[in-house]
Amino acid sequence: MGTPSDRVPLAERVEELLAVGGPLPIVAAGDPVLRRAAEPYDGQVAPALFERFVEALRLTMHAAPGVGLAAPQVGVGLRVAVIEDPAPVPDEVRVARGRVPQPFRVLVNPSYEPAGAGRAAFFEGCLSVPGWQAVVARHAEVRLRAHDEHGRAVDEVFAGWPARIVQHETDHLDGTLYLDRAELRSLASNAAMAELWSQPTPRRAASALGFELPGPAA
């Protein structure tokens, strides 16, 4: 049995959310909307309303704060996500994780595929699973295909941390949470992360907590 919001047309759901104003409430793990494949965007939401919704996603992402947000995370099962990362990290973290600034991007109907055999494993978290982080091994490079908010085609290769963000947010649109791909022995509270595992890579955590990392890219 679905929740009442499941039966509301997408455009009406978006209108309801935007009527409140300010950052949108973020849906937590356990809500069915996070476990269903999102509906591809094909004009179900009128252009002016869609533009407002994208801006609300951006505002909510900044307020959280986070580096990405998918529409299902605010209760809208639409295949749309936003990403942006100012990458305010020390140089050693930037180098180890390949974390470079990313401008604001809107991803409409995105999909990705690996661009090479490399894998990279790092701690990551999720706004829908607050308070926790875990190590996830992901493709080191991916080819993203999508459209932007203006309907222009996107076909681009992302590497390093931007590739991780693309994978994380696109996974949301397929009903997949990062914990589905995580090494669960690495699961750590934010407090434990700050106290014990703030190093640029998770090698020390892997040794202490007893989990394996993929090859040299880890």
Swiss-Prot record:
GO BP term, pick one:
translation
Protein name as it appears in the record:
Peptide deformylase 1
* Sample GO molecular function, one term: peptide deformylase activity
**What top-level branch of life does the organism fall under?**
Bacteria
Q: What HAMAP family does the record point to?
A: Pep_deformylase
Instruction: Enumerate the cofactors the protein uses.
Output: Fe(2+)
> Which family is this sequence assigned to?
Belongs to the polypeptide deformylase family.
Q: What does this protein do?
A: Removes the formyl group from the N-terminal Met of newly synthesized proteins. Requires at least a dipeptide for an efficient rate of reaction. N-terminal L-methionine is a prerequisite for activity but the enzyme has broad specificity at other positions.
The cysteines covalently paired via disulfide bonds are none
Residues the entry annotates as binding Fe cation:
126, 168, 172
Q: What class of enzyme is it?
A: hydrolase
Provide this UniProt record's keywords sorted from A to Z: Hydrolase, Iron, Metal-binding, Protein biosynthesis
Which gene is transcribed and translated to give this protein? def1
User: Which residues does UniProt mark as catalytic?
Assistant: 169
> Which InterPro entries does the UniProt entry name for this protein?
Peptide_deformylase, Peptide_deformylase_sf
Q: Which reaction does it catalyse?
A: N-terminal N-formyl-L-methionyl-[peptide] + H2O = N-terminal L-methionyl-[peptide] + formate
Against Pfam families, the record matches this protein to: Pep_deformylase
Cofactor: how bound? Binds 1 Fe(2+) ion.
**Enzyme Commission identifier(s):** 3.5.1.88
